[in-house]
Amino acid sequence: MEICIVCGARPNFIKVAPLIRAIDKSEKEGHDIHCSLVYTGTETDPTLEASLFSDLELRKPDVCLGVDCENLNELTGRVMSLFEHYLSHRKTDIVVVVAALASTMAAAIVTKKQGIKLAHIAAGTRSFDISMPKEINRLVIDGLSDILFTAGMSNNFIANREGAELSKVYMVGNTLIDNLRFMHGKWQDPSPLEGLRLQEGGYMLFTLNRKALIADTEGLHAMVNAVAKAATGMPVVAPLRGLARKAVEEALEPELKGVFHIVEPVGYLEFGWLAAHAAGVITDSGNVAEEATFNGVPCLTLNDYTEHIETVKVGTNELVGEDPEKITAAIDAIRNNKWKKAQIPDRWDGRSAERILQVLVAGN
């Protein structure tokens, strides 16, 4: 059985690593199964630090398509052309894509045009905002997929409501959590590297990636200064790069700059330590919010929505948007130990990749 797994960005590798480890293990045990790992980006992508693959105990991509462009339509077309060429020269029984990037959608379209079975990890996630490119990608990928692997019952409900047959939807849990369980005891304290001398539960972790928020000068100014004021006396550790770093530095009021400790992005094991030991997490990332729920760490999501609703319903996540009053109230609640009680969502047991592999093998 030949499986092709496609990644379009750094977070994708983290989500597919457990599945690739499971497939490689099965192959070594003598089973007739093999997977190739395709990255749509370039070999020199600065977000793919060498330590990422060693940290995840994951081999590097077998093939890099080399697509690197800002225009999403151009990116989609180039990935489609190059991935079609790849598939036409390699026997493939099933293609597995993850999440909802433009590159992921491009690979999904080509897969079906080639008559190859398609599986989607993290299916059934929705923001219900069709103006967002990722929402369009999700609808297309789920609509094309032969197998939908969901992380929770709410995702199952969405997929079924949109017409997916019950027989092709599988609630397998969250592969991101498989990694967190796999990495237990392996996190590395990054504070000596930055001279921060952080204490467990004595700092806030801040991440920012959303381009629309970074570009909103007025909104960003109000948001980051609300964070800094509410967290005064407690360092806010912010691993940021590029435009996000520049925007936050410029938005902070001079008297509050000392609250934020803006550092270069850290490796996977170092970030895992920061996320697990923070008093609270402030982020616009759904993946980081999922980590916070697993770790039992309070989380403020800088959006008015989340595709990962379990983190709000039963987890530690709260949606505060960019509202300074909500942000202030939430940080006050964290500092006064008044955060809501939370639980680990169903099937966050570290066996998601195992379930996915069972389905893939059974359906071959």
What is each residue range found by the language model?
Residues 154, 318-364:
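Leloir-type glycosyltransferase catalytic cores
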Residues 4-7, 12-24, 28-30, 52, ...:
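Active-site and donor-binding regions of nucleotide-sugar-utilizing enzymes
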Residues 97-98, 109, 120-121, 148, ...:
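A donor-sugar binding/catalytic signature common to diverse glycosyltransferases
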Residues 35-42, 236-242:
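Short internal beta-strands
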